[in-house]
């Protein structure tokens, strides 16, 4: 009898633990196959997360930034010729002053895409967002964070150019390694870049891909 009671209590505790975990991380399965607009950053002041400037190498790196932070990056680097090197394979851009990306809980979006395919898909997704429309902004668990009115939509390239900076894209999977094509393109880019041009690398979190390319630059 005691053994049955112990087994029952163990099962009850196990079910309770599972319930608590599900409650703590509520995934909305109703939209698991939808393409969601998720928030990458809403910072309006200061520099982006994990910003570091290696002045002796004329390179810097960071996490994803918002439109408001572009001028801060420019002023902090303080060089006449700056090129932003975007390493994200995931489609992303700016809505109002939010940095956003397109994400699916149930699908690996843009997996295997070339840089050109990534940019083409990104342009289509951003162009589908109409000014003055109401849209939901999600987190990566599928939870709605907020609903906003769209005042402006922009690619990172356009926002960068408006601030007098140059832009270059190399699409690398989050958590992955660059393809041989991307590495070859990056080597050609470095060989042909203007002398004295400062490169600012970024991905989403400013860690894996950003650090990888900052190291590749030194090889």
How should each PLM-predicted stretch be described?
Residues 17-200, 212-219:
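Cys-dependent protein tyrosine phosphatase-like superfamily
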Residues 1-12:
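Bacterial N-terminal signal peptides that target proteins for export
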Residues 206:
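Conserved G/P- and acidic residue-centered "switch" motifs that form tight phosphate/ATP-binding loops
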Residues 209:
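Conserved SAM/SAH-binding loop-helix junction
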């Amino acid at each position: 009898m005691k053994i049955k009671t112990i087994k029952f209590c163990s099962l009850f505790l196990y079910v309770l633990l599972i319930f608590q975990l599900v409650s703590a991380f509520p995934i909305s399965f109703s939209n698991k196959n939808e393409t969601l607009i998720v928030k990458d950053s809403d910072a309006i002041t200061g520099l982006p997360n994990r910003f570091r400037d290696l002045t002796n190498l004329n390179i810097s790196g960071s996490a994803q930034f918002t439109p408001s932070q572009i001028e801060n990056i420019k002023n902090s680097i303080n060089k006449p010729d700056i090129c932003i090197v975007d390493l994200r394979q995931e489609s992303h851009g700016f809505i109002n002053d939010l940095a956003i990306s397109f994400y699916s809980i149930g699908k690996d979006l843009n997996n295997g895409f070339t840089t050109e395919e990534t940019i083409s898909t990104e342009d289509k997704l951003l162009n589908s967002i109409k000014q003055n429309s109401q849209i939901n902004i999600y987190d990566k668990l599928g939870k709605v964070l907020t609903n906003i009115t769209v005042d402006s939509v922009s690619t990172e390239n356009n926002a960068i150019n408006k601030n007098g900076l140059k832009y270059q894209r190399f699409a690398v999977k989050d958590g992955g390694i660059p393809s041989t094509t991307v590495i070859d393109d990056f080597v050609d880019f470095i060989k042909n870049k203007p002398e004295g041009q400062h490169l600012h690398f970024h991905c989403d979190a400013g860690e894996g891909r950003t650090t990888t390319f900052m190291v590749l630059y030194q090889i």
